[in-house]
Amino acid sequence: MTDASLREVSASGQVIATFRPFNIFTTLNCGYAPAGTPVRASITAATADGAKIAHARGTCVLQHIRADGRRETLETWDIATGKDGEASLSFQTGESGLYALSTTLEDGHGNKVEESFQFLSYGKGKQNPFKINPLSIHPDKKEYAPGDTARLLVTSDYPDARVWTFLRNSWKNESRRLVSLDRQTALVECRLTREDMPNMGVNAFTVRNGELHEASAELLIPPAGQLLAPSIVPGKSQYRPGEQGNVTFQVKGPD
C-alpha cells in the first residue's frame, strides 16, 4: 500500500487451512511393543500451528488387528490431556501381531477428532498373521549409545521370507546377513560402537514373486560428551533502521 507521502509499505503473512480443528499424535516409548512387557504411550493433541490442546477429553481403545482387517477390542481407557496437551497410559500386549491405539478426543469447544495409531508387537509364543508392508525394519529405540545392542524387528507380509540385511551402509561380509523370517518376523541384533556415531543406516531387501522389496532404517547415536550448545544474544531487544548493533555468540560444551 502507499501512504499520503507516497511511501510504499508492504507486508506478508501465512494462513494455515486445515480439514480438522486439531490433530492427535501418538507415540510409544519403544519402536515396537514386546509381548508381555509394559509399554508407555504418549498422546498429544495440537492444532496445525503447534498450539497444544489442554483439557481435551475422550477415550483410547487398544485393538488387535487381524489379518482379515477385523479389529478386536482388548481394553478401553478414559483419558484427558493436561495443561501441556499431553496424556499418557501404560498397557501390554499378550501376543505378537498388529495392534492399534484408537483415540477420540473432544476439546472445550465441542470439536471431536478421531485418530488411529498402528504398531507391531513381537515376542515368543503364538505368531498371529498380519498385513502391513512387503518389508519393514523397526528399531527398538529412538536413540542409542555406544555399547548398546540394537534389536531390529524385520517384518514382511510374506511368511517365511528370506531377507538380506546390510548394516552400516556396507557390503562387507561382517555387515551382510541372510535372515530367515519365522512366519512374518525376525529379530536382528547389532552391537553399536563409537565408530557408528552419530547415526547408522540399516538396509534390507527381499525378492518375492519376481519383485524386489526394499526397506531402510536409521539408528540415531548422539555423540555423548561431544555435543555443543551454541547461542546468540543481541546487545538489546530492539534496534532502529540503520542503527549499528552487536551480538554475543557463545558456545558451551558439556563441562
Identify the residue ranges that each predicted region occupies:
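A structural signal for beta-strand and strand-to-loop patches characteristic of beta-rich domains
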Residues: 1-255
